[in-house]
Amino acid sequence: MFRNQYDNDVTVWSPQGRIHQIEYAMEAVKQGSATVGLKSKTHAVLVALKRAQSELAAHQKKILHVDNHIGISIAGLTADARLLCNFMRQECLDSRFVFDRPLPVSRLVSLIGSKTQIPTQRYGRRPYGVGLLIAGYDDMGPHIFQTCPSANYFDCRAMSIGARSQSARTYLERHMSEFMECNLNELVKHGLRALRETLPAEQDLTTKNVSIGIVGKDLEFTIYDDDDVSPFLEGLEERPQRKAQPAQPADEPAEKADEPMEH
């Protein structure tokens, strides 16, 4: 991971045209626990996997309330996410106080992009090490946005970020055509199935490690934790078991291992 003199500061470009400090911040997002966002014609849903630092600690909150029509889920550094969430809450309050209307979701995401871009260009600062999935509902309908430490943001029909999130994205891509016509319960189940793909084979979703956020038409942003998640998990079919690979006979020489793939 050492980049010689090209990763000492965020204002230094490498000869290949890369800013390594931003790439390191993107890696912090990949280390966070997975979260999934998806939407239908009427609702947007966030599903997040919660972690506990130890057996003695409570599970960390992964879905945060921003306004009545907006919520976020996070992957990466929780402290950075808390600061960005407070900024978003203040912008929503300002909109209601000054203009007497809720802040459009796309406008809020644009403000977040502007705020997260500043540390990528100024000496002595570091990028925010957190990725956000933003779910909201406004006059344009439901929205799912993804933001990155690089200050890029994307409007998505469905997205997953965090550790092992590629498995969840594969599920979302396979079933994306079904989401727009789903009712709320079916949409949440799709999110849970996608999130379950990020877990090791010996683990499963429980009321302790799952959090759900829902917003939509005539429904303010609501977070479901602990026992409130039970009705959604009860309707979820059991996880299909993966076939175990047959053991190699001891008297046969082991085949030469494949060369490691480059990352």
Curated annotation (Swiss-Prot):
Pfam families: Proteasome (PF00227), Proteasome_A_N (PF10584). GO terms for molecular function: lipopolysaccharide binding. InterPro entries: Ntn_hydrolases_N, Proteasome_alpha, Proteasome_alpha-type, Proteasome_alpha1, Proteasome_asu_N, Proteasome_sua/b. There is a cross-link at K115, K208 (Glycyl lysine isopeptide (Lys-Gly) (interchain with G-Cter in ubiquitin)). GO terms for biological process: immune system process; negative regulation of inflammatory response to antigenic stimulus; proteasome-mediated ubiquitin-dependent protein catabolic process. This is Proteasome subunit alpha type-1. It comes from Homo sapiens. The modification N-acetylmethionine is found at M1. Coiled coil: none annotated. The keyword Phosphoprotein applies. It is found in: Cytoplasm; Nucleus. Component of the 20S core proteasome complex involved in the proteolytic degradation of most intracellular proteins. This complex plays numerous essential roles within the cell by associating with different regulatory particles. Associated with two 19S regulatory particles, forms the 26S proteasome and thus participates in the ATP-dependent degradation of ubiquitinated proteins. The lineage of its organism: Eukaryota, Metazoa, Chordata, Craniata, Vertebrata.
